[in-house]
């Protein structure tokens, strides 16, 4: 399978990855790099647009190469707020040829601004420091629900710092970040009456810090990785439109780890654990609670089989106290060198903390306590293959059951529109196919389509499902015209269900409609380390809305410069 790489042409990058070695993409100037190699600390830019909107069942992709499969045994950092987005299609370059510093800046209509800077400093052979800053935002007029213009503004600024040191037996990692989101709410109309709120503005502050250790000596009888950290989410202007109760502040002490031992060269057993202690201010609708998850597992990695057999045992205190159990099973059979038949049966708990709600929509608000979402089963059956060099395809289908699934719609309250969350049990059948092709560093293309069938037991099912997709289609292509010049083409389509309400002898559709976003772009390196880039999004000039009900920009352009050093 050939890995893909997004170019630095994209208008908005994933802000939490801004500190990584951002100059990896510039290694493409070396024409000898026509092979795919594995790279550490690569920088994967993400498009923060329509692709961020849906939180859907994830279909995991098994490897097709004849080698041991990795099941993400390394810990994830305690992350700041991110959008859900398409997986980056990137080509992996040799890191020792890449620069360690990177700066990019772009500007466009709707007041779009995109600034990223980062540096990776290898202080010594054992010490590494990563620094990153970013600014993403816009300030322009968008179409209001009532077909009027709404003066919208949204700016997100982030700074991150991470440090690692290799001791003889273990590696120490510590780091943290601070993020600020400043924006305004959409009023119910341009001439709305006096509101109980002092202003339409809002300011979210997110902070995090983590420290962790992981083993690096394979001769130890047990391998391990451990991490603990603190996450903070603060809201400056309380959301008091519902019974004068505000969301307040949230603090989370997050601890996780994985300890495992090898039975032989092909087998190992281990246990992962994760604990979250959540604390809320006294004026919050949420109450303090603790969530603990244990994940014992057995793994087999042979020439033909990759098997993981485990279980998720989750306990939670507070109003939703109790124990839940779900499977953690993966079976993948490799035959004829590059064909894989796989079956996954997964599950587990997702905390509906402020960060997850904010990932749905920064315009969110609470009118009730939000229990955690639990997935008793998410089963996927698929077939993946690479019949010829450079071509890869994946056909899959699955079924997902979830308790307290998150749904959302737009609510007019206190003179402004907020994203309102609903919860209920949901059942989702899904199926689709994915095709990828790559030729050296000259051409990459990816096409993926997925059908979804959502069901709930709620009598207002249409209201709950109006923002969920029926069908998703994503296409992306990248081509090198000649050395230094690359062009890009992308398309995203999301089909949603209708939400029709009968009004006397007539009916009215309150659905959000479909998403159709065609984008093009190009980048040109005219000096050794200096490039110019540009992109046009929503080329068809469609009016569509994000899952949380707020309008997206129509045809928008962004251009700028990037420098590697």
Predicted regions span which residues?
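Outer-membrane beta-barrel translocator/receptor signature
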Residues: 83-85, 94-103, 107-145, 151-157
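Short coil turns and loop connectors of transmembrane beta-barrels in diderm outer membranes
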Residues: 125, 168-169, 218-222, 265-267, ...
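Flexible loop and strand-edge segments within Gram-negative outer membrane beta-barrel domains
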Residues: 138-141, 145-158, 172-223, 231-250
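Exposed, low-structure sequence patches enriched in small/polar residues
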Residues: 98, 103, 306, 314, ...
């Amino acid at each position: 399978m050939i890995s893909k790489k997004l170019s630095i042409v994209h208008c908005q990058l994933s802000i939490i990855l801004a500190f990584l070695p951002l100059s990896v993409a510039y290694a493409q100037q070396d024409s000898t790099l026509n092979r795919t190699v594995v790279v550490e600390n690569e920088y994967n830019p993400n498009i923060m647009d329509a692709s961020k909107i849906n939180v859907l069942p994830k279909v995991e992709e098994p490897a097709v190469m004849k080698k041991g499969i990795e099941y993400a045994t390394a810990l994830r950092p305690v992350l700041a707020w991110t959008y859900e987005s398409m997986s980056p299609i990137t080509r992996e370059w040799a890191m020792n040829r890449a620069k360690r510093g990177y700066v990019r800046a772009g500007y466009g209509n709707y007041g779009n601004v995109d600034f990223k800077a980062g540096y990776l400093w290898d202080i010594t052979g054992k010490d590494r420091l990563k620094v990153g800053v970013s600014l993403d935002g816009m300030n322009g007029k968008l179409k209001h629900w009532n077909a009027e213009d709404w003066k919208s503004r949204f700016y997100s600024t982030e700074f991150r710092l991470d440090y690692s040191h290799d001791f003889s037996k273990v590696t120490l990692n510590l780091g943290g970040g601070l993020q600020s989101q400043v924006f305004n709410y959409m009023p119910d109309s341009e001439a709305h009456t006096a509101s109980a709120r002092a202003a339409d503005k809002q300011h979210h502050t997110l902070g995090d810090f983590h420290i962790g250790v992981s083993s690096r000596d394979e001769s130890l009888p047990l391998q391990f990785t451990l991490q603990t950290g603190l996450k903070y989410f603060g809201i400056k202007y309380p959301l008091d439109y519902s019974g004068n109760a505000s969301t307040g502040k949230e603090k989370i002490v997050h601890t996780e780890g994985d300890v495992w031992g090898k039975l032989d060269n092909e087998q190992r057993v281990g246990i992962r654990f994760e604990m979250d202690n959540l604390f809320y201010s006294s004026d919050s609708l949420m109450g303090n609670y603790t969530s603990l998850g244990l994940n014992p597992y057995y793994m087999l990695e042979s020439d033909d089989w990759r098997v993981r057999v485990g279980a998720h045992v989750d306990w939670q205190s507070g109003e939703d106290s109790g124990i839940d159990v779900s499977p953690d099973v993966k079976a993948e059979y490799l035959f004829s060198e590059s064909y894989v038949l796989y079956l996954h049966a997964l599950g587990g708990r997702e905390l509906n903390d402020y960060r997850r709600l904010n990932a749905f929509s920064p315009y969110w608000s609470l009118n009730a306590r939000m229990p955690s979402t639990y997935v008793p089963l998410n089963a996927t059956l698929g077939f993946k293959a690479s019949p010829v060099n450079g071509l890869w395809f994946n056909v899959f289908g699955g079924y997902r059951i979830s308790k307290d699934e998150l749904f959302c719609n737009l609510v007019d309250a206190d003179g402004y529109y907020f994203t309102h969350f609903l919860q209920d049990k949901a059942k989702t059948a899904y199926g689709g196919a994915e095709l990828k092709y790559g030729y050296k560093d000259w051409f990459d293309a990816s096409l993926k389509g997925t059908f979804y069938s959502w069901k709930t037991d709620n009598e207002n099912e249409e209201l709950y499902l109006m923002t969920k997709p029926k069908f998703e289609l994503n296409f992306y292509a990248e081509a090198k015209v000649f050395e230094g010049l690359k062009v890009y083409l992308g398309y995203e389509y999301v089909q949603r269900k209708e939400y029709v309400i009968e009004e006397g002898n007539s009916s009215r559709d309150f659905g959000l409609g479909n998403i159709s976003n065609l984008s093009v772009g190009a980048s040109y390196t005219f000096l050794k380390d200096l490039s110019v880039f540009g992109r046009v999004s929503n080329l068809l000039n469609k009016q569509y809305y994000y899952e949380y009900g707020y309008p997206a920009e129509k045809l928008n352009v962004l251009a700028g410069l990037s420098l590697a050093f």
